[in-house]
Regions:
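Conserved glycine(s) of the Walker
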Residues: 57, 197, 289
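Conserved C-terminal guanine-recognition region of P-loop GTPase G domains, centered on the G4
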Residues: 92, 116-186
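P-loop NTP-binding site
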Residues: 226-334
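Active-site glycine-centered loops adjacent to acidic/histidine catalytic or metal-binding residues
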Residues: 99, 161, 191
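Amphipathic alpha-helical dimerization/coiled-coil segments
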Residues: 4-37
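Conserved, well-folded catalytic cores of nucleic-acid-processing
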Residues: 68, 87-91, 106, 121-128, ...
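Conserved G1/Walker A P-loop phosphate-binding module
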Residues: 38-116, 120-124
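Canonical P-loop GTPase G-domain recognition
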Residues: 155, 164-222
Length: 334
């Protein structure tokens, strides 16, 4: 007999009414009596790995739980190439959410490294969250990931994400399909984009954590190095403005960070492409594309750095960079 969830959190009729207003991302708070320690002084902390197919909405979910942007988001596969840790802290708990690259079959050294990150993070986690995209049918990829999670034997839960795109009937069908994956634990219908269902999910994840002290300062939201954070924000704007093979074929590297006398920051960055034709697309007619990428990226960099940022952005070609082990090391994709 297959295991079934103890319950489907939030599946009452009141849950559907909650979509009328929705919750702003990061606006939720757990009541004191919902916290595991209940004000007793006991704390819980640990790592929760988020696993799922590409485009399941893992990064959006991490941002919703943390209450701010720590992982870039786009509708392109391979948006997440590095292990991203988002940190959410309450009065007596701390969740370290590990946003893993989407599980896929490795095709080159880049994707081999991405899948290696998945395997290592699952082995080191305290709990695992399987994230399913409600806009995708449950398929072989989801079953493969569910088996991998069962094999590590950690406390687990399942999220059916993007339920704001579904009516009640399709959501209930998705929850049933999630239960058929044989995962232990609860299934949570969630809209990470709107924040609906996030408080119930957080409360449950906290209860899966071991007792222990906080792993990071309470005000820290991510442990990514500054250069990587800035490069990711530039890459996000590149992904949002390109199509077809270009998003898969670009990476961003920060060459230099230069402190200016007026307190602003000058960022020297380059976009790596694999072919001259991709470089032409990224530059655009009269330089319009790279200018648009740079303008949008500067706004994000200003917010991230908390000060004025100047961006010197160039586009370069490095054929076969996804197979260049030295460059992958330098980019921090390990």
């Amino acid at each position: 007999m297959r295991p079934t969830p103890a319950r489907c959190s939030g599946c009452s009729s009141g849950y559907w009414r909650s979509f009328d207003s929705g919750l702003a991302v990061g606006s939720w708070q757990l009541a004191e009596n919902d916290l595991v320690g209940g004000g007793s002084g006991m704390t819980r902390s640990g790592f929760v790995a988020l696993a799922g197919r590409p485009n399941a909405g893992k990064s959006t979910l991490v941002n919703a739980i943390v209450g701010g942007k720590v992982a870039i988001v786009s509708d392109k596969p391979q948006t997440t190439r590095r292990e991203i840790r988002g940190i959410a802290t309450g009065d007596d708990w701390q969740l370290v959410l590990v946003d893993l690259p989407g599980v896929q079959r490795p095709r080159d050294p880049l994707t081999e490294r991405m899948q290696g990150q998945v395997e290592r993070s699952l082995a080191d986690a305290d709990a695992v969250l399987l994230v399913l995209g409600g806009d995708q049918r449950v398929g072989p990829g989801d079953r493969f990931i569910a088996r991998a999670i069962r094999n590590v034997g950690l406390p687990a839960a399942t999220v059916l994400n993007k339920v704001d795109l579904l009516d009640e009937g399709r959501t209930l069908a998705g929850l049933a399909a999630a239960a058929d994956l044989g995962m232990e634990g609860e299934v949570f219908p969630v809209s990470a984009r709107r924040g609906t269902g996030v408080p119930e999910l957080v409360e449950h994840l906290v209860r899966l954590l071991p007792e222990g002290p906080f792993l990071y300062p309470p005000d820290e939201r991510s442990d990514l190095p500054e250069r990587v954070r800035l490069a990711e924000l530039i890459r996000e704007q590149t992904l949002l403005r390109t199509r077809e093979e270009v998003p898969h074929s670009v990476e961003v590297e920060i060459d230099e960070l230069e402190e200016r006398d007026d307190g602003s920051l000058l960022v020297h960055a380059r976009i790596w492409a694999e072919t001259e034709s991709q470089k032409g697309i990224l530059i655009g007619a009269g330089g319009r594309m790279v200018k648009a990428i740079g303008t949008a990226a500067r706004r994000e960099l200003d917010r991230e750095a908390g000060r004025r940022v100047h961006l010197d952005l160039t586009v370069r070609v490095r054929k076969g960079w996804r197979r260049d082990e030295g460059l992958l090391d330098r980019l921090g994709i390990d």
